[in-house]
Regions:
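Conserved beta-propeller blade repeats
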Residues: 1-17, 29-119, 147-171, 200-213, ...
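C-terminal/domain-terminus segments
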Residues: 7-23, 136-137, 293-308
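Beta-propeller blade signature
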Residues: 11-28, 67-74, 130-139, 183-186
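A cross-family structural signal marking well-folded subdomains
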Residues: 119-120, 131
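Long, heptad-repeat coiled-coil alpha-helices that serve as cytosolic signaling/dimerization stalks
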Residues: 126-130, 329-331
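Non-catalytic extracellular/periplasmic "stalk"
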Residues: 139-149
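Serine-hydrolase catalytic core recognition
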Residues: 156-340
């Protein structure tokens, strides 16, 4: 079932070799099938109960992912925990939290019949990270906590003690406050600070940052984060750098989704392109440049879509009155450099 061009009921299967791992006379080891998956196997996670495991699979042509909970040895259908386009950020349920099991092996972190998930929480308003719990009996999910607008906060640690869930640790930052660690408790709005790291670059706090949304000529919604120098005055047109990275999508609905957060702390290091903001440039960072189509033909319109995305970003900055359309550069890292070439 490994040939993607051939029809197959199941493309992969997970096998197990039992201890004491004695080889047959011909030198082979006997392996037994544990579970089969319809698409190509992508991952395997264990629970503390050895009779249950979680598999993930991926359909390359549709760019579709599924996560399933299996009862080993059961003839029943597995419980679907996730079933979505891998490019649909708004529907991403987050990653399953793991914990060291009784034998030192990482297993899914369970509590009260459910598994914890942490994710970016992408939305039309930007990323709002969350902590949720998914019922492993029904598949239903309940959000336990979500980052509020005005800050950017991600879950970094859950209690390691099995059977206990009374607090969790997050990494909290904002436009003006550097990342620090805090302890939160479910159901309570406040938090207890763990660290108090100072601002390492206070001279950068005046940099202006905002999310910009606009459309490509074909109607595909695009977005970018616009950075302006601290001393920028309304109506002043600056040289512009558009920094982007082309990504492939099957449809426009997922291509136009917003990601990232303007509430993150700005910190510059290395050869960051954002240093240009301190030199009087406007920078459109993370300008979306989707290449939409099926896997077989999307490259036929690659250059046209790439150029259209860059033009839309430049036009948007010019319409805002912050960029001089005659002084523009387009660049990006790795694959993003293709944008500069065209």
């Amino acid at each position: 079932g490994g040939d993607p061009k051939a029809e197959a009921a199941h493309r992969d299967r997970w096998m197990a070799i039992s201890a004491p791992f004695v080889r047959e006379a011909d030198g082979t080891l006997t392996a037994e099938e544990v579970v089969r998956v319809e698409q190509r196997a992508r991952g395997l996670m264990f629970l503390e109960d050895p009779g249950r495991l979680i598999t993930s699979e991926y359909d390359r042509d549709r760019r579709w992912t599924r996560t399933l909970l299996h009862e080993v040895g059961s003839d029943g259908e597995p419980l679907v925990l996730e079933d979505r386009s891998s490019q649909d950020r708004y529907a991403d349920p987050g990653a399953l939290a793991m914990v060291a099991g009784p034998y030192g092996r990482m297993v899914v972190r369970e509590h009260g019949g459910g598994a914890f998930r942490t994710g970016r929480g992408s939305s039309p308003k930007g990323d709002l990270p969350f902590l949720s719990q998914q019922d492993l009996g029904t598949g239903e999910t309940k959000v336990l906590w979500r980052c509020e607008p005005g800050a950017y906060e991600t879950v970094v640690a859950l209690p390691w003690a099995r059977g206990f869930f009374g607090a969790f640790v997050t990494r909290r930052e904002s436009k003006t406050a550097p990342p620090n660690y805090v302890i939160r408790r479910p159901g309570l709005s406040g938090f207890d600070a763990v660290t108090d790291f100072p601002d390492p670059q206070p001279s950068l706090r005046g940099i202006k940052k905002q999310r910009v949304t606009y459309e490509r000529a074909d109607g595909v919604p695009l977005s970018a984060t616009l950075y302006l120098p601290a001393d920028h005055q309304p109506g002043e047109r600056l040289p512009l750098l558009v920094w982007g990275y082309p990504r492939e999508y099957n449809d426009a609905s997922t291509a136009g989704q917003v990601s990232g957060s303007t509430d993150r702390f700005t910190r510059l290091s290395g050869t960051s392109h954002l240093f240009l903001v301190t030199q009087g440039y406007a920078v459109m960072d993370g300008a979306t440049m989707p290449i939409i189509g099926d896997a077989e033909t999307m490259n036929d319109t690659f250059i046209a879509q790439l150029v259209a995305s860059a033009k839309a970003a430049i036009d948007a900055a010019a319409e805002l009155g912050v960029a001089d359309p005659d002084r523009v550069g387009v660049a990006g890292h790795s694959y993003g450099e293709i944008g500069r070439a065209h």
